[in-house]
Amino acid sequence: MAVGNPLGLAGTVTTGIVSALNRPVTTSDAQTDPTQQTTSDPVVTNAIQTSAAINPGNSGGALVNASGQLIGINSAIASLGSSNGSSSQSGNIGIGFAIPVNEARSIASQLITSGKATHPYLGVASKDGVVADGSAKRAAAVLTNVVSGTPADKAGLQAGDAIVGVDGNSIDGSLSLVAQVRERTVGDKVTITVLRDGQRRDLEVTLIAKPATTP
């Protein structure tokens, strides 16, 4: 059930199902080209997709299960004018997104403790690509830039590497890479699997707090 104030109608409750989990969704202020991403681009990390009606005014409201337990925070809708999940003035078409409660709780805790939220930073830019993986081909996030001195650089990541996994989770493009990084916390050690020169390599990266300014 989604609770909120759609179109100014306070206390509205709508029902639906969880349509999908771990759905990387670009927020409305992300850069124009969704195939060119950096790990500091704004996204909803691995969002919950729901069929419960979500409309403008629902953002920030609760998404709860049948027992009344909070499972997410309503955040965005897909519209006919926007295929990347960003909110718009269009109405609900049965595809809404919510930030998972665990991520929302982590951010809220940081805001209460320090007055600000920190986000993990890898230090790469990537694009969607299709690369050879043995005798097959697969989708991946292909690095277009690795910023000097960042966790990615220190771990040995290079421009041209095709990232296909993070901690065993499959990466099929730039958005899924960004979402996986955003799901972590500052200080986490993550194993990044890349394809380089036709060979798989596992590199360990320690994520740092996102700098105030990034290249």
Regions found by a protein language model. Name each.
Residues A52, A66-S67, S79-S82, I93-G96, ...:
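C-terminal recognition in membrane/secretory proteostasis and scaffolding
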Residues V3-I17, N22-G60, N65-A108:
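Active-site loop architecture of trypsin-fold serine endopeptidases
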